[in-house]
């Protein structure tokens, strides 16, 4: 089996190393599976936002299925979140946080977890003991369910989870209840 992992793009005319380096049609022709890395919209040096926003993932998939068979596509999504210090400043690094740690942190600081409908992602704000404000975006059962719905909507081969070593019990329960799994290493 030949597989590849490619950056997300939404058109043939996107410029930049991550976009022009990947010919979606060629990957679809020559590969048995293509992982589209639809994560890191929110990343270490970005402003606070969802790591894998469904609205952005949908744009990428709408383009991808015009270039390769959906049955070859594995939807890549994150299994982690980020904790940003506020106010965010250019060049300021966010801290990676596991989904379980994010949920525990929210509970420990009595933060209200909110859900962004467009991104289909969970987030909360809190103030740490030093008086600094934070914003945390992460994946929970609702966001995992929304991403799995994209697999059905586009008729994809399945998913590829980035950072499987970060346990996300709620996400795994949703995955196991909706799909059968095959481990490919």
Language model features: what each stretch is:
Residues 1-108:
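Substrate-binding surface in catalytic domains of secreted glycosidases
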Residues 15-25, 139-152:
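Short, acidic/polar
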Residues 45-51, 133-137, 161:
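Second-shell loop/turn segments in exported
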Residues 51-58, 138-145, 166:
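Soluble non-cytosolic domains of exported or imported proteins
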Residues 66-70, 153, 181:
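Secondary-structure boundary motif
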Residues 77-150, 177-185:
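Glycan-binding loop/region signatures in secreted carbohydrate-active enzymes
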Residues 145-161, 166-167:
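Conserved, well-ordered alpha-helix/loop/beta-strand core segments that scaffold catalytic motifs
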Residues 161, 166-185:
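C-terminal amphipathic alpha-helical "assembly" element
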């Amino acid at each position: 089996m030949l597989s590849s992992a490619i950056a997300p793009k939404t058109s043939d005319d996107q410029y930049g190393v991550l976009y022009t380096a990947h010919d979606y049609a060629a990957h679809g022709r020559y590969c048995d599976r293509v992982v589209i890395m639809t994560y890191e919209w929110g990343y270490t040096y970005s402003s606070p936002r969802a790591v894998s926003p469904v609205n952005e993932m949908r744009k990428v998939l709408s383009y991808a299925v015009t270039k390769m068979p959906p049955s070859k596509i594995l939807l890549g999504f994150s299994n982690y979140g980020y904790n940003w210090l506020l106010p965010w400043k250019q060049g300021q690094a966010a801290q990676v946080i596991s989904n379980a740690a994010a949920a525990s942190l929210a509970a420990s600081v009595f933060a209200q977890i909110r859900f962004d409908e467009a991104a289909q992602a969970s987030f909360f704000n809190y103030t740490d003991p030093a008086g600094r404000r934070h914003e945390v975006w992460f994946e929970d059962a609702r966001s995992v369910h929304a991403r799995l719905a994209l697999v059905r909507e586009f008729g994809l081969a399945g998913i590829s989870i980035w950072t499987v070593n970060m346990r996300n019990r709620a996400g795994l329960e949703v995955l196991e209840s909706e799909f059968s799994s095959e481990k490919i290493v």
